[in-house]
Amino acid sequence: MKKGFTLIELLIVVAIIGILAAIGATVIPGLLGGAKEKVVKQTHSEVVSYINSWKGKCILVQGVADRAKTEMTGCRECVTKNTPYGGSPQDFTGVCNTPLTNLNWMFAGHFVVNGSKNPYDNTEVGVDAKECGHNRSCYDNANHLGVTYINVKSESGGGNLYYGEFEIKSFYKDGASPLITVMPWDARD
């Protein structure tokens, strides 16, 4: 009776393990890259959905300046501490009467406060405003892989009547064109 493996049998097993490891080493990074792309695409979809959820609410609550400050996660900090637009916080304290160039910060802040991370680099936020509104994830050219940007494409109006377009831009894969969604915004509605 034989009580072990021959050298040839052991070499065959080692060769099979080596082949499987080589195949796994080439397949696994592709699977991980695909998962990261899906996370960025999902974040893009969530940003679009979140902004859409705030559309049209101004007509229902026009003049209720604190609505966003009390209902939008992360908005309180944006509204009470950041006044880069030159106004005082009480002048611009809600979705209905906020310039789009500040509103994009408020929307991005919602995702920052809720822990959105860049799947390609988890030390960076996953959603940001082009005007560099939150944390240190500030890119002047707004094209960093894994980040979804809430940019302001156009803005008009004043007082309680700001309107224009947001451009949601997500860079999900090196060398690929970004996902872009242009969203009209009209506080007059």
Regions found by a protein language model. Give the residues of each.
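N-terminal single-pass transmembrane signal-anchor helix
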Residues: 2-29
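Intrinsic disorder/low-complexity segments enriched in polar/small residues
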Residues: 3-4, 43, 47, 125, ...
